[in-house]
Amino acid sequence: MTGNEHPIGVFDSGVGGLSVLREIRAVLPHENLLYVADSGHLPYGNKPAEYIEQRALTVGRFLLSRGAKAIVVACNTATAAAITVMRAEFRVPVIGMEPGLKPAVALSKSLVVGVLATEGTLKSAKFRDLVGRTTEKVEVIAQACPGWVEQVERGDLGSPATRDLVRRYTEPALERGADTLVLGCTHYPFLAGLIADVAGPDVHIVETGSAVARHLRRRLEADGLLTRRMAPGVELFWSSGPAEVAGRSLAVLWPGVHRVRPLPAGFAAGD
């Protein structure tokens, strides 16, 4: 197998990164994709940065062992904690996530932008640096959203409990004048409809999965790594948590999944 026929590896703390995988599949229909849900260590957002870094390196090594020609860190928290060390260790392109503050600032007329993200992302030096670089004239309201990741992991995208959680953590930024909301966690696009219901039609909602997918395509093209196959690509899925639990969530978020493989023990265990 030549280098450009190898698969692309994608991972997240759970199933949230499927929102990014969906965008990758849309722009790279012929590529084979590997996806790891690190559900045995979910959520990343409330864990120490050192722990997340070790998990990201471990999952990255697994993807490389499966022949990945590039790795997408489809998790804002893991990007903030681990992208630098991953790029230093791995000799393949490593693409990360960051909240879409730059497009949000361009869209905002009230000059108030809300960022909905995990505690780990909002407390990271990477996020503070991003705010400092892009929001000189804009007020940024950083709002952690505990419970959102867990609801998405359960495949619970519309129950009264989920609606209440979404309202609880969306309204504070709106009450302070935000006219643009940034979804700073890859789980949150699965709640975008509920967020829009709370925010109303005049509030912009910014997510970055499509931008990351386009960046990945450009990088693969520049490095000569795009597949030459014309057949549709396939997806393979692993989970470090109970595979049957991940399978139920995947059935809701990625219809057509037939199998979720357990991550091998050497990669699934904590560090």
Swiss-Prot record:
Where substrate binds, per the record, is at 12-13, 44-45, 76-77, 186-187
* PROSITE patterns per record: ASP_GLU_RACEMASE_1, ASP_GLU_RACEMASE_2
GO MF term list: glutamate racemase activity
Top EC class for this record: isomerase
Write out the coiled-coil annotation as residue ranges. none
The catalysed reaction is: L-glutamate = D-glutamate
Q: In which pathway does it act?
A: Cell wall biogenesis; peptidoglycan biosynthesis
- A Pfam family assignment: Asp_Glu_race
Under Enzyme Commission nomenclature, its number is 5.1.1.3
Picking any one GO biological process from the record gives:
regulation of cell shape
Entries under InterPro entries matching the protein: Asp/Glu/hydantoin_racemase (IPR015942), Asp/Glu_race (IPR001920), Asp/Glu_racemase_AS_1 (IPR018187), Asp/Glu_racemase_AS_2 (IPR033134), Glu_race (IPR004391)
Query: Sorted alphabetically, which keywords does the UniProt record give?
Result: Cell shape, Cell wall biogenesis/degradation, Isomerase, Peptidoglycan synthesis
Question: What Gene3D superfamilies does UniProt report for this protein, alphabetically?
Answer: 3.40.50.1860
Q: Which residues form the active site?
A: 75 (proton donor/acceptor), 185 (proton donor/acceptor)
Nucleus as UniProt keyword = no
Q: Which top-level group of life is the source organism from?
A: Bacteria
Q: Which family does it belong to?
A: Belongs to the aspartate/glutamate racemases family.
What is the role of the protein in this entry? Answer: Provides the (R)-glutamate required for cell wall biosynthesis.
Cite the HAMAP family for this sequence. Answer: Glu_racemase (MF_00258)
Name of this chain's protein: Glutamate racemase
Natural source organism = Methylococcus capsulatus (strain ATCC 33009 / NCIMB 11132 / Bath)
